[in-house]
Amino acid sequence: MKKYFQPSFVILIIFTVLVLGVVGNMSVDQKRCWATLKENNCVHDECRSMCLKKNPKGHGRCIKSSKGRIICLCGYDCP
């Protein structure tokens, strides 16, 4: 029974350390900034590409605005 317990326990410890390392690496205090890159006719791949050019860690998304247009928003960590 010990042989089954030890590898499972070691795997659990390694997994826990990895998860805590990833979660600990995230910045809780970091605010998110948004920039409108295109006012209408957003294409997802184009929006994502423009956002990555603006900020290498940015995430471009096409969303529907309050005026009914599909706009490109770029989300990134504020400087």
From Swiss-Prot:
<feature type="signal peptide">
    <location>
        <begin position="1"/>
        <end position="24"/>
    </location>
</feature>
<feature type="disulfide bond">
    <location>
        <begin position="47"/>
        <end position="72"/>
    </location>
</feature>
<feature type="disulfide bond">
    <location>
        <begin position="51"/>
        <end position="74"/>
    </location>
</feature>
<keyword id="KW-0929">Antimicrobial</keyword>
<keyword id="KW-1015">Disulfide bond</keyword>
<protein>
    <recommendedName>
        <fullName>Putative defensin-like protein 137</fullName>
    </recommendedName>
</protein>
<comment type="similarity">
    <text>Belongs to the DEFL family.</text>
</comment>
<keyword id="KW-0611">Plant defense</keyword>
<dbReference type="GO" id="GO:0005576">
    <property type="term" value="C:extracellular region"/>
</dbReference>
<dbReference type="GO" id="GO:0050832">
    <property type="term" value="P:defense response to fungus"/>
</dbReference>
<keyword id="KW-0964">Secreted</keyword>
<dbReference type="GO" id="GO:0031640">
    <property type="term" value="P:killing of cells of another organism"/>
</dbReference>
<keyword id="KW-0295">Fungicide</keyword>
<keyword id="KW-0732">Signal</keyword>
<dbReference type="Pfam" id="PF07333">
    <property type="entry name" value="SLR1-BP"/>
</dbReference>
<feature type="disulfide bond">
    <location>
        <begin position="42"/>
        <end position="62"/>
    </location>
</feature>
<dbReference type="InterPro" id="IPR010851">
    <property type="entry name" value="DEFL"/>
</dbReference>
<feature type="disulfide bond">
    <location>
        <begin position="33"/>
        <end position="78"/>
    </location>
</feature>
